[in-house]
């Protein structure tokens, strides 16, 4: 089975950045978000993972930049939007901007009834981001704790969640390899699909994730590994096929 790859474009203060372990203030600036997204599309990406970090941290938003990316590239690539989607207004804005799929994170922990209602309404256009430290969920902008991972999954499974985006916060942006055990554990406990995120640093990491395909891990988000040129997107896509 092939693995779908989603190059990430994380936007803070109008610029494409990468964080270390999701910490505000740890940014490395990579310039224009639109240029970054163009690069990944030209390199063969079928999906882009687009994150509004200011919205996630509650420090404003980059809605105009995100809309510009979707407007130019939305007919060439599927766009998954993430960051600060926690109510009807923010979800509707992302969907109206042209997102093929929207990730909700904090809201799934803070407002389960709302989360259940939007999963029911939008089906596989909504994924839930599970940002994990150990077996504990990290909530708003990765700052607060949000409860037990598997208790939360049990609820989300019961309301029909179709996809989890699983990030080991300790590994994100650290180039230290993905948490294969965590991915295996999550995937083996749910019928939902799983997107792997965080820590991917070499092509062998993608090969290891691909081995979890039969459990339902069918996608991976690539961030710092691409920006730091650990490998090219073309090389990664070749491995993922």
From Swiss-Prot:
Q: Does the keyword Isomerase apply?
A: yes
Where primarily located? Answer: cytoplasm
Q: What class of enzyme is it?
A: isomerase
The molecular function terms of the Gene Ontology recorded here are: 1-(5-phosphoribosyl)-5-[(5-phosphoribosylamino)methylideneamino]imidazole-4-carboxamide isomerase activity; phosphoribosylanthranilate isomerase activity
| Name of the molecule in the record | 1-(5-phosphoribosyl)-5-[(5-phosphoribosylamino)methylideneamino] imidazole-4-carboxamide isomerase
EC number per UniProt: 5.3.1.16
* Extent of the signal sequence: none
> What is the annotated localization of this protein?
Cytoplasm
GO BP term, example: L-tryptophan biosynthetic process
Source organism of this protein record: Bifidobacterium adolescentis (strain ATCC 15703 / DSM 20083 / NCTC 11814 / E194a)
Q: Name one GO cellular component term.
A: cytoplasm
